[in-house]
Amino acid sequence: MTDIIRMRSELRLRPATRADLPRIHEVRHGTAENRLTDPTLVTDVEVAWYMDEAIFLVSEDEVGVQGFTCVNHQTGYVWALFVIDGAHGRGHGTRLLDAATARLREVGHRQAFLTTGSGTKAEGFYRSKGWQPMGKNMKGEVVFRLWL
């Protein structure tokens, strides 16, 4: 029990910096689910916009960055939330999601949206956090909404 408490107390959230980009790419490509078939689909311009203009947070522990989230504060869309496979179940995803939705509330949003693959662990994670499925988009991904 004390190991669980100790691990969770060592998690830190902070804004992402340019110095985090190599590790952010490792995290993004270090997930078994939702692999990018073409890594060039996520452009440096897109990542730079989120870093400069949106909510872009990392979760780290004593080892380093283990997860990140990017949220468009203008639309309430959660563009990305990833935790590297070896760090699942340690609270990184929950803390990132809670912080992102809190920030959206602070800027006046009453709801948030995201999409994820159908039948994935991510789908179960979002459902367990109270996100409601709204149907599927044209790519077959589940569209979720959370009232803030």
Positions of the model-derived regions?
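Conserved GNAT acetyl-CoA-binding A-motif
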Residues: L104-G117
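Extreme N-terminus of proteins, especially the signal/transit-peptide cleavage junction
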Residues: D3-L11
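Acetyl-CoA-dependent GNAT
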Residues: L11, P15-A80, I84-G86, L97, ...
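Conserved active-site alpha-helix within GNAT-family acetyltransferase domains
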Residues: T94, S118-G135, V142
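Conserved acetyl-CoA-binding loop-helix of GNAT-fold acetyltransferases
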Residues: G89-A102, R127-S128
